């Protein structure tokens, strides 16, 4: 859908949405986003120009349906997919992508680390995707030298970063905020560095005794990104991997650097969002969101979870959705889903579905709590359908219609029960929603109460007004 929009920009030195917004231009992508979000085009342009909203939209991803991430737009959800050296292939990852889009993923990250042709997998995903695709280029940089940190050069990093841009990647996690002087700060942690990309950069710095090349070559990366309109997702290499490590000196030192990098990218008119934790106790979530807004000048915040407890392997889509809902309420712009397989293995298609639905619930709950216009409309419509025993309408309005119908039909599968005024929980005689109290009933009751002159309800005998 974007081919004609893109062609007239090709050859420009900077094709980013931020660049056009700062010139007062409402691009076709901004206009499209304004309709999707039910926002004025001028507001979308202003928020993009300010850096509070991003529209990840690489010019080489022509089949993309533009979307927005930012405090003025609805809270978004990202789904991670990707092949590992031990599992999956390109066709399986495309199936996961299609499933993720079906269940409402707003963006998808390809986190493939090896075992397959990474370029083939990525290209297949981008070609099949109507939503923005993100990647972590350091994975392929390391794979390109067969896992040898010693052989991995600064130019290797930049070569892979540009390759991802050329292939149409809309945003890349760039772990530029981890500095060599931050590494001693992890000494007191229970779980050290839990970011895969951060771990690669830490190993590189420890071996070469040099500063993080993604930091020292950051201006070069900006030059690459603005030619393709690729968005920075500034990686939090020192995010906490457990409750004990949350909000520690290591995390906050890196966050300060991420704020510096945000403003440096903005000087090049390159779009930025900032990644965040991780594992955070409930009482620290608001602090983390507000601290990011302060340090990073309100660039959109993109958090993984956060998990609010560490004792539930197999259920971390739940432990993290709790934290995600709170983070969204306090101003986080996008939530990265966690599946039931987190910490245990590579998620399959069913895990993708479970994780996504949990996070769509969290994001929607956050939108309601933030009083976004229209956020509760679907809830109210479903509630009216529930009160009217319109079962098919309830299924249709559900986040997961198939699951809702499946659970209903376990005990009452016949079509006749789609008109029944009960489900198997209460049965035909005890459903409280069968008791329909009308306005006329309440008006009659008000007259009786008024006539009683404020008598105690516990002892007063109320005469029915016919």
Swiss-Prot record:
GO terms for cellular component: cytosol. Pathway: Cofactor biosynthesis; thiamine diphosphate biosynthesis. Zn(2+) binds at residues 279, 343. GO terms for molecular function: 4 iron, 4 sulfur cluster binding; carbon-carbon lyase activity; zinc ion binding. Its cofactor is [4Fe-4S] cluster. [4Fe-4S] cluster binds at residues 423, 426, 431. It is an enzyme of class 4 (lyase). This is Phosphomethylpyrimidine synthase. It comes from Synechococcus sp. (strain RCC307). The lineage of its organism: Bacteria, Bacillati, Cyanobacteriota, Cyanophyceae, Synechococcales.
